[in-house]
């Protein structure tokens, strides 16, 4: 027969005392967690959420005495109505870990409090990363410096691209069909500067969006559309230069004004389809947008938070496919340029010059005037070809700068869609503004590498040729200009005589 121990009540009292100590330690830990979370997330949590239900003490003790592996539903949990979902989930997981430790090591109040505080700091830090909290706000000096830099960048972008459009409109030598694509590119960059960069600067400096939820979608759509139009215009420019250099005789028949206008319209329609259609349907981002909190106040954010499907599809259409085409075109242009240089060296060898002089003294009578000079007939370095190669170099530099500016962003854009915590917020903003800065670089490239644009910029800035006095672009066709006729004749002479020997060239010159 079982005989009760005379001090059996002490055996029961000791675990109950340890349990009460553990509850007190949990209460202190919960208070520390509440204070830490309130500080790190800059939100106020009601003091009532840190109160522990005293009636749960018996339940906790009973559960641990009976060997339960977790807290009951009435155990020490913060009020879920006042906490984010991530924090509530982390709290439940943390309770399970604490329960396991209590079962393993016993109820030691000091150890339990230390474990809870350390875990609460870790989970609070992880929660900040998962939820996507905004970083610490910039200081006043940083805001002023960044604001001045962004203002200068926006001004250069707007002014430079307006100059490009005015130069093409007012300068007769720039009113060529190929420059219509440059004008379309300048318009896209002008939209980026005026409609995208201005609102992006205000959003990044304030840390939240103040222009309304509806305009946020419109702004994001313009961002995607203008960037896509810029890339597709560069792809069209590279194709235009390739045809112009590779097959100049057929260029006038293939690339007409109508073809150029239709191509530009198709570029803008495709850019609008990629941007406005999915964004208006709301399939470009997750259902729950991020919320920025400051001193208990919630502010909406407007960021390029894309779904993985839309990020991959839009990036391929807007960037990767056109880039593959442009790189392939410029590789072919480079090979053709190398072959062209070799042909120039082969035609102008010193031995052939002596041979031409010898045939000239034998076959041509002295009293018969020359109609053409041999050195001008077979040379490939006519002004027509020189200007073509300068244009190709200019467009190549434009494409290179464009890739440097936008490749990092599009790589990060796809990565961020699949892994929200892999890319920091500041890194994403810096790479986004690096892409925006490309809109300011193109006019600078024109002024450095293209003398015609440089002279046109000078005339516009000095008001030597007011744009209001310029003739209509549609009334001046490139085929009707004197320069086009002269270059076309020189080009045909070069092509017809490029395969002839020196003796045949002397016979032609003697006619």
From Swiss-Prot:
Disruption phenotype: Simultaneous knockdown of Dop1R1 and myc restores the induced male-male courtship observed in the single myc knockdown. Glycans are attached at residues 53, 63, 74, 117, 123. Keywords: Cell membrane, Disulfide bond, G-protein coupled receptor, Glycoprotein, Lipoprotein, Membrane, Palmitate, Phosphoprotein, Receptor, Signal, Transducer, Transmembrane, Transmembrane helix. Residues 20-142, 207-216, 280-310, 413-427 are extracellular. Gene3D superfamilies: Rhodopsin 7-helix transmembrane proteins. SMART domains: 7TM_GPCR_Srsx. It is found in: Cell membrane. Residues 1-19 form the signal peptide. Residues 170-179, 240-258, 332-391, 451-511 are cytoplasmic. Changing residue 69 to I: In strain: Canton-S. Coiled coil: none annotated. GO terms for cellular component: dendrite; membrane; plasma membrane; presynapse. One of its GO terms (molecular function) is G protein-coupled serotonin receptor activity. Belongs to the G-protein coupled receptor 1 family. This is Dopamine receptor 1. It comes from Drosophila melanogaster. The gene is Dop1R1.
């Amino acid at each position: 027969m079982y005989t009760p121990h005379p001090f059996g009540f002490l055996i029961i009292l000791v675990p109950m005392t340890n349990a009460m100590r553990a509850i007190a330690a949990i209460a202190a830990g919960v208070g520390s967690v509440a204070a830490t979370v309130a500080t790190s997330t800059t939100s106020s949590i009601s003091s009532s959420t840190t109160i522990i239900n005293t009636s749960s003490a018996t339940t906790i003790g009973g559960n641990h005495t009976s060997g339960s592996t977790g807290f009951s539903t009435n155990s020490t949990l913060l009020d879920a109505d006042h906490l984010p979902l991530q924090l509530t989930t982390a709290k439940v997981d943390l309770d399970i870990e604490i329960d396991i430790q209590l079962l393993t090591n016993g109820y030691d109040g000091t150890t339990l409090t230390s474990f809870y505080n350390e875990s609460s700091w870790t989970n609070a830090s992880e929660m900040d990363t998962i939820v996507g909290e905004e970083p610490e706000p910039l200081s006043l000096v940083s805001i002023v410096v960044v604001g001045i830099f962004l203002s200068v960048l926006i001004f250069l972008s707007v002014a430079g691209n307006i100059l490009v459009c005015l130069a093409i409109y007012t300068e007769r030598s720039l009113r060529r069909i190929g420059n219509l694509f440059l004008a379309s590119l300048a318009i896209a960059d002008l939209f980026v500067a005026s409609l995208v960069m201005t609102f992006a600067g205000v959003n990044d400096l304030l840390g939240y969006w103040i222009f309304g939820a509806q305009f946020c979608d419109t702004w994001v759509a313009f961002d995607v559309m203008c960037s896509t139009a810029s890339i597709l215009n560069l792809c069209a420019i590279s194709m235009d230069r390739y045809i112009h250099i590779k097959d100049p005789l057929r260029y006038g028949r293939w690339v007409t004004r109508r073809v150029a206008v239709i191509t530009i319209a198709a570029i803008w329609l495709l850019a609008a389809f990629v941007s406005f259609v999915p964004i208006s349907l709301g399939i470009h981002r997750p259902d729950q947008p991020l919320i920025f909190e400051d001193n208990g106040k919630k502010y909406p954010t407007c960021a390029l938070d894309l779904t993985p499907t839309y990020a991959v599809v839009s990036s391929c259409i807007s960037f990767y496919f056109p880039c593959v085409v442009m790189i392939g075109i410029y590789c072919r242009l480079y090979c053709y340029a190398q072959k062209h240089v070799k042909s120039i060296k082969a035609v102008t060898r010193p031995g052939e010059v002596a041979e031409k002089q010898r045939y000239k003294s034998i076959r041509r009578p002295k009293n018969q005037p020359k109609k053409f000079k041999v050195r001008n007939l077979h040379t490939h370095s006519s002004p027509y070809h020189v200007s073509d190669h300068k244009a190709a170099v200019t467009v190549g530099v434009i494409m290179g700068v464009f890739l440097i500016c936008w490749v990092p962003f599009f790589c990060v854009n796809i990565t961020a869609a699949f892994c929200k915590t892999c890319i920091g917020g500041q890194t994403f903003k810096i790479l986004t503004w690096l892409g925006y800065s490309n809109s300011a670089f193109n006019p600078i490239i024109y002024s450095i590498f293209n003398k015609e644009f440089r002279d046109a910029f000078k005339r516009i800035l000095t008001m030597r040729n007011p744009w209001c006095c310029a003739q209509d672009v549609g009334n001046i066709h490139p085929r009707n200009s004197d320069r086009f006729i002269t270059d076309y004749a020189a080009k045909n002479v070069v092509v017809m005589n490029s395969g002839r020997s020196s003796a045949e060239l002397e016979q032609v010159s003697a006619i």
